[in-house]
């Protein structure tokens, strides 16, 4: 008999029902649970998969480069970045029809998709200028992807499989990743900016043919060896520098100017190079801190074991954490996801507030798309961090090893943690909603002057302390006489104060009562999401109801009132609930960002300031008003180039709504439905010639919820993506 899927589980492969397929897919990545899996084999498989992951990333990037070089208009865009629309790729579709071909054709090009990903600005900033360079980059990445795939295969061969001891050698791995991965790669990137990108921004082409003969600075390496490093900061580009040409260009390569290049409204490349160099130095030093073969440096275990406050308030302190983290991949993954989630959210913020790429801040649709994209990814990563934290408690937590240390004490006072989060969420929820609906009511009854409007004083003070003069707080950097301001203008960031008080960029936007309210609405979402996730993780191993449910596993389902209390201790259900809260919270974040920016770009910030104080304002003046481009993608007079987003908007709603079919139902209904269909199938002539090997059974409760959640999530994100792109592109191109 042929072996059935899944090969990794004998028990599942022999299951006579369709469960075999779904459980097989569900546990394909749960490597720990596979037949015959040893700890060493587990580490080796995960390690090899990293090479595959990198290969996929490089392949994808190579695809972007290749398609833009082949079907895009990069060279034309480079000649006039503000007026030419960047093309992502051609659209090949015989079903188009005449009106669509007209709508999607730009000039004399065949129907195309416009790029809203920011790759044009990115490649331009780092020194690309021609299609040939894009092709070369694409081929280079393909070769790299092939090398990585080979490396992944190689590390699965018996001779080249690293041992378990190698994987658990924390100090060596830290040194290698800090110095090698983060330090040297930052140094290499600094080198690229200094040797290729900065010359390109000054009209000097540096390629493979001349990079060894074109010094990035006229003084060469002499100042470096003589210690006269200020030479590299002298003579920066002037304020009237025309980007990409020698006009107004300087010679500085490592500066501390602050603010933005007046023409491109992006950070000075020489500032970025300086920043990247500093990071390289810090990480290369950090990568020499830990004790490995030479008997010098720190030992992680000693540091953790020594962290025990003298007052005794933290019990055994960090004792046991070294072994706990070393031996738990879920704990490591949880920490990594949490850090990466925060970094991704910061990327969303900094990508528009301190734009690193030339002319990106003039491409409003791309800015909106990038913000939304990074914010959603951050949400998924952070929820994943807590999910793996919960799996850690179920599978990897050893109460003996962690006796009376900080981890055990967290678990012992979890009620206090959970209830404090609960109080914070309740306070934020009732007060914020109360203010909104009060304002809604008085506006609806024609008395808008009775709204309760708070000026965000503390936030304004923080902005003023950073140099924003409009609030007239006259404190720290917004006071012309403070020592910080005096030093700032002479030594560091002379361009900062000009930038923060310039209305042409996104640094510290002016805020008011609408911002105050939505800030607290977002705080409510963040606290509630955190509450659900923290409770799910802390109660994952057990609660008052069931002291230790280690053997029940992570996907222990919430079985409703029939089995009282099971919902209280299901980590899977906490993850499931938190996903909805996370998605809705990021909805509020992106609505806020998008609406505020739409009004600023349109020169009418007053619309946001007035309408954002009550919920009807959000529904009417943001969602409804901005959905007109989507509704008019098709109309009685034909169609326009937003029709594709109109389709996506409808399709997103459809997927989203399908999710509810799985979310608002119960298992018995599905089983009955399936058996009815099977009965009908078996009695229908011709149809009953087709048989199946597996007995059809309904999805389990947990599976149906997952299917529902996936539809809800995908539909939600697709719908909002279409809305953001079409509403912004409809107004601002």
Swiss-Prot record:
Cited SUPFAM superfamilies: Photosystem I subunits PsaA/PsaB
Catalysed reaction equations from the record: reduced [plastocyanin] + hnu + oxidized [2Fe-2S]-[ferredoxin] = oxidized [plastocyanin] + reduced [2Fe-2S]-[ferredoxin]
Topology of this chain in the membrane: Multi-pass membrane protein
One matching Pfam family: PsaA_PsaB
Binding of phylloquinone, residues: 670
Binding residues annotated for chlorophyll a B3, in chain numbering: 661, 669
Swiss-Prot/TrEMBL GO biological process terms: photosynthesis
Record's subcellular location: Plastid, Chloroplast thylakoid membrane
Annotated Gene Ontology cellular component terms: chloroplast thylakoid membrane; photosystem I
Superkingdom to which the source organism belongs: Eukaryota
Record-linked InterPro entries: PSI_PsaA/B, PSI_PsaA/B_CS, PSI_PsaA/B_sf, PSI_PsaB
Cofactor-binding details, from the entry: P700 is a chlorophyll a/chlorophyll a' dimer, A0 is one or more chlorophyll a, A1 is one or both phylloquinones and FX is a shared 4Fe-4S iron-sulfur center.
UniProt: [4Fe-4S] cluster binding residues: 558, 567
Keywords: 4Fe-4S, Chlorophyll, Chloroplast, Chromophore, Electron transport, Iron, Iron-sulfur, Magnesium, Membrane, Metal-binding, Oxidoreductase, Photosynthesis, Photosystem I, Plastid, Thylakoid, Transmembrane, Transmembrane helix, Transport
Membrane-traversing stretches: 46-69, 134-157, 174-198, 272-290, 329-352, 368-394, 416-438, 516-534, 574-595, 642-664, 706-726
EC number: 1.97.1.12
Record-level Gene Ontology MF annotations: 4 iron, 4 sulfur cluster binding; chlorophyll binding; electron transfer activity; magnesium ion binding; oxidoreductase activity
Binding positions for chlorophyll a B1 per the UniProt entry: 653
Similarity field: Belongs to the PsaA/PsaB family.
Role summary: PsaA and PsaB bind P700, the primary electron donor of photosystem I (PSI), as well as the electron acceptors A0, A1 and FX. PSI is a plastocyanin/cytochrome c6-ferredoxin oxidoreductase, converting photonic excitation into a charge separation, which transfers an electron from the donor P700 chlorophyll pair to the spectroscopically characterized acceptors A0, A1, FX, FA and FB in turn. Oxidized P700 is reduced on the lumenal side of the thylakoid membrane by plastocyanin or cytochrome c6.
HAMAP family: PSI_PsaB
Assembly and interaction partners: The PsaA/B heterodimer binds the P700 chlorophyll special pair and subsequent electron acceptors. PSI consists of a core antenna complex that captures photons, and an electron transfer chain that converts photonic excitation into a charge separation. The eukaryotic PSI reaction center is composed of at least 11 subunits.
Protein name: Photosystem I P700 chlorophyll a apoprotein A2
UniProt organism field: Phaeodactylum tricornutum (strain CCAP 1055/1)
Gene transcribed to yield this protein: psaB
């Amino acid at each position: 008999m042929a072996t059935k899927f899944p090969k990794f589980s004998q028990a599942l492969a022999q299951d006579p029902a369709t469960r075999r397929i779904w459980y097989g897919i569900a546990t394909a990545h749960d490597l720990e649970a596979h037949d015959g899996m040893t700890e060493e084999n587990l580490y080796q498989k995960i390690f090899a998969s990293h090479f595959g992951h990198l290969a996929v990333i490089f392949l994808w990037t190579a695809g972007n480069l290749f398609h833009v070089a082949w079907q895009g208009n990069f060279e034309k865009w480079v000649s006039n970045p503000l007026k030419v629309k960047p093309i992502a790729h051609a659209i090949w579709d015989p079903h188009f029809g005449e009106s669509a071909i007209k709508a999607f054709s730009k000039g004399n090009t065949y129907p195309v998709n416009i790029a809203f990903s920011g790759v044009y600005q990115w490649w331009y900033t780092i020194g690309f200028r021609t299609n040939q360079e894009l092709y070369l980059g694409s081929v280079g990445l393909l070769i790299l992807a092939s090398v990585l795939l080979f490396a992944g295969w190689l590390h699965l061969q018996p001779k080249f499989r690293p041992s378990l001891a190698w994987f658990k050698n924390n100090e060596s791995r830290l040194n290698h990743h800090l110095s090698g991965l983060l330090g040297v790669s930052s140094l290499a990137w600094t080198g690229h900016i200094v040797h290729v990108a900065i010359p390109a921004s000054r009209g000097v082409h540096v390629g493979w043919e001349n990079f060894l003969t074109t010094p990035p600075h006229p003084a060469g390496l002499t100042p470096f060896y003589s210690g006269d490093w200020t030479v590299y900061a002298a003579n920066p580009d002037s304020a009237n520098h025309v980007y990409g040409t020698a006009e107004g260009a300087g010679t500085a390569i490592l500066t501390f100017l602050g603010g933005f290049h007046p023409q491109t409204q992006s950070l000075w490349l020489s500032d970025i190079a300086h920043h990247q160099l500093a990071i390289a130095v810090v990480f290369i030093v950090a990568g020499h801190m830990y004790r490995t073969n030479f008997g010098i440096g720190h030992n992680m275990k000693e540091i953790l074991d020594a962290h025990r406050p003298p007052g005794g308030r933290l019990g055994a302190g960090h004792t046991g954490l070294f072994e706990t983290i070393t031996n738990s991949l879920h704990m490591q993954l949880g920490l990594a996801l949490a850090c990466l989630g925060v970094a991704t959210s910061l990327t969303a913020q900094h990508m528009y507030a301190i734009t690193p790429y030339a002319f990106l801040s003039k491409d409003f649709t791309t800015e909106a798309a990038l913000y939304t994209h990074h914010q959603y990814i951050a949400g998924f990563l952070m929820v994943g961090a807590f999910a793996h934290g919960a799996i850690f408690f179920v599978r990897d937590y050893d109460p003996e090893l962690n006796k009376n240390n900080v981890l055990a004490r967290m678990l012992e006072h979890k009620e206090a943690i959970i209830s404090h989060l609960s109080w914070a969420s309740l306070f934020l929820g009732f007060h914020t909603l109360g203010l909104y609906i009060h304002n809604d009511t008085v506006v609806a009854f024609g008395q808008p002057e009775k709204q309760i409007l708070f000026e965000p004083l503390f936030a304004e003070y923080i902005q003023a302390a950073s140099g924003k003069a409009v609030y007239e707080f006259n404190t720290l950097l917004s006071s012309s006489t403070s020592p910080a301001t005096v030093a700032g203008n002479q030594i560091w960031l002379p361009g900062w104060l000009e930038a923060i008080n310039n209305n042409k960029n996104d640094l510290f936007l002016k805020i008011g009562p609408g911002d105050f309210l939505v800030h607290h609405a977002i705080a409510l979402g963040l606290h509630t999401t955190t509450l659900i996730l923290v409770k799910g993780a802390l109660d994952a191993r057990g609660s008052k109801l069931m002291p230790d449910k280690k053997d029940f596993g992570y996907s222990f389902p919430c079985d409703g009132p029939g089995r009282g209390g099971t919902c209280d201790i299901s980590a899977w259900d906490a993850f499931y609930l938190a996903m909805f809260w996370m998605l809705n919270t990021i909805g509020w974040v992106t609505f806020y960002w998008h609406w505020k920016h739409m009004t600023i770009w349109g020169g009418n910030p007053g619309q946001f300031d007035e309408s954002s104080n009550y919920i009807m304002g959000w529904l009417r003046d943001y969602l409804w008003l901005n959905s007109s481009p989507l509704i008019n993608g098709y109309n009685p007079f034909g169609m326009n180039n937003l029709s594709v987003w109109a389709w996506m908007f409808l399709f997103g709603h459809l997927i989203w709504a399908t999710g509810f079919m799985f979310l608002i139902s119960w298992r018995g209904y599905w089983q009955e439905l399936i058996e009815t269909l099977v009965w009908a199938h078996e009695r229908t002539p011709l149809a009953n010639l087709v048989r199946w090997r597996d007995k059809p059974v309904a999805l389990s409760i947990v599976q149906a919820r997952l299917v529902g959640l996936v539809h809800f999530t995908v539909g939600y994100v697709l719908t909002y993506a279409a809305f953001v792109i079409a509403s912004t592109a409809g107004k601002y191109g």
